[in-house]
């Protein structure tokens, strides 16, 4: 650790401020190489007292002499001035030693004047081995002039759980606050804090809390006027103006998404989805899904879905007449036209000079005695 100066006599008022924030007491013991350090760096000292010099508070786990008699100092300590909104302390656990801290209390006793004190570190954790800044904030609300009392209680322990440093119990400190004025004022219940910035209530934002916050946001040019309430432009409605109020009718399953505008399903176009992209209509229940491209329903195929499909097929002696219905050539029968009539039966049943027709009753009756009929197929 670099050598730091003793507390300068010219800054007696800073002594009181230091005690206001962190009037620590230390356990007696010999200095240790691996130990705890706490100080105010030169930059923060310049802000507070006008000159740059590190101010040592804790060295090698022991308090600087000026911090010992807190009770006597508390009787004459002044309130933290209006222009000081926060104070930075730097701390470090030197070497390999581990130190744990906990902020037991950060509490304002005058919440109409000042909110609870703040720190920029977790309320419970370890003191870092690298020099790090702990900022204690005094958030005046700016609602009124006055002096706010507050409480800061922190404890530091070693790795064995023994208390090394702790603020005195029931120590009360004071901060001077004043009413602030924000240029343009704060609207919708917002108030001007000590930094002359509007702090807005839930549901509003903006420099003057003039903008309402809608979740989800207003769409299609809608205006959020109060939290969760949108005023929609002509042609739109809904909680967040997400729905179009269409006078235009969208045909063929189209959806109106903007006044006068339709989103068309695949295969359709036009202002009202009235134009098919297929010059020739798709047959047998097929749907146009692109330019001259049909999506066929089950049992049909082809560019226009005009060809029926038979599974597994009608073979070399039949043609597919309807989905899964084969029309067999003369002399053939069966589900897939793969069975042939006997020649003697054909000649016996066919009159002289006549041709066998596919649906000849006498032939069909003769075959029904030999082969059971197969339904849903044409012989």
UniProtKB/Swiss-Prot annotation:
Cellular localization per UniProt: Secreted
Main subcellular localisation: secreted
Residue ranges of every copy of the WIF domain listed in the record: 38-177
Cystines in this chain: 140-177, 182-192, 186-198, 200-209, 214-224, 218-230, 232-241, 246-256, 250-262, 278-288, 282-294, 296-305, 310-320, 314-326, 328-337
GO BP field: negative regulation of Wnt signaling pathway; positive regulation of fat cell differentiation; signal transduction; Wnt signaling pathway
Domain EGF-like: 178-210, 211-242, 243-271, 274-306, 307-338
The UniProt record lists the keyword Glycoprotein: yes
Organism domain of life: Eukaryota
One Pfam entry name: EGF_DL_JAG
Regions of compositional bias (Basic and acidic residues) in chain numbering: 364-373
Stored PROSITE patterns: EGF_1 (PS00022), EGF_2 (PS01186), EGF_3 (PS50026), WIF (PS50814)
Cellular component GO terms, alphabetical: cell surface; extracellular region
Residues modified by glycosylation: 88, 245
UniProt KW keywords: Developmental protein, Disulfide bond, EGF-like domain, Glycoprotein, Repeat, Secreted, Signal, Wnt signaling pathway
InterPro entries xref list: Dev_Signal_Modulators, EGF-like_CS, EGF-like_dom, WIF, WIF_sf, Wnt-inh
Described purpose of this protein according to its UniProt entry: Binds to WNT proteins and inhibits their activities. May be involved in mesoderm segmentation.
Protein name: Wnt inhibitory factor 1
């Amino acid at each position: 650790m670099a050598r730091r100066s003793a507390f300068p006599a010219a800054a007696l008022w800073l002594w009181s401020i230091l005690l206001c924030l962190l009037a620590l007491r230390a356990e007696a013991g010999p200095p240790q190489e691996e130990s705890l350090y706490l100080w105010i760096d030169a930059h923060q000292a310049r802000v507070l007292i006008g000159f740059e010099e590190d101010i040592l508070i804790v060295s090698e786990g022991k308090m600087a002499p000026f911090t010992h008699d807190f009770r006597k100092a508390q009787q004459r300590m002044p309130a933290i001035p209006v222009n000081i909104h926060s104070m930075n302390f730097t701390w470090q656990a030197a070497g390999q030693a581990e130190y744990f801290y906990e902020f037991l209390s950060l509490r304002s006793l005058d919440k109409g004047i000042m909110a609870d004190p703040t720190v920029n570190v977790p309320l419970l954790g370890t003191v870092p081995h690298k020099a790090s800044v702990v900022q204690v904030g005094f958030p005046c609300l700016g609602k009124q002039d006055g002096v706010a009392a507050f409480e800061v209680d922190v404890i530091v322990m070693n790795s064995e759980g023994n208390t090394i440093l702790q603020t005195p119990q029931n120590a009360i400190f004071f901060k001077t606050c004043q009413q602030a004025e924000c240029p343009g004022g704060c609207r919708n219940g917002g108030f001007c804090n000590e930094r002359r910035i509007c702090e807005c209530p839930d549901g509003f934002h903006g420099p003057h809390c003039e903008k309402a916050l809608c979740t989800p946001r207003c769409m299609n040019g809608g205006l959020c006027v109060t939290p969760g309430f949108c005023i929609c432009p002509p042609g739109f409605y809904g909680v967040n103006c997400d729905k179009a109020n269409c006078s235009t009718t969208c045909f063929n399953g189209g959806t109106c998404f903007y006044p006068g505008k339709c989103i068309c399903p695949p295969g359709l176009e036009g202002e009202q989805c009235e134009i098919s992209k297929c010059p020739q209509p798709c047959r047998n229940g097929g749907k146009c899904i692109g330019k001259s491209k049909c999506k066929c329903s089950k049992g049909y195929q082809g560019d226009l879905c005009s060809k029926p499909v038979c599974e597994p097929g009608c073979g070399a002696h039949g043609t597919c007449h309807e989905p899964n219905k084969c029309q067999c050539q003369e002399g053939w029968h069966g589900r897939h036209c793969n069975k042939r009539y006997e020649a003697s039966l054909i000649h016996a049943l066919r009159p002289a000079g006549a041709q066998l027709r596919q649906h000849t009753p006498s032939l069909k009756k003769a075959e029904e005695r030999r082969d059971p009929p197969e339904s849903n197929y044409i012989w």
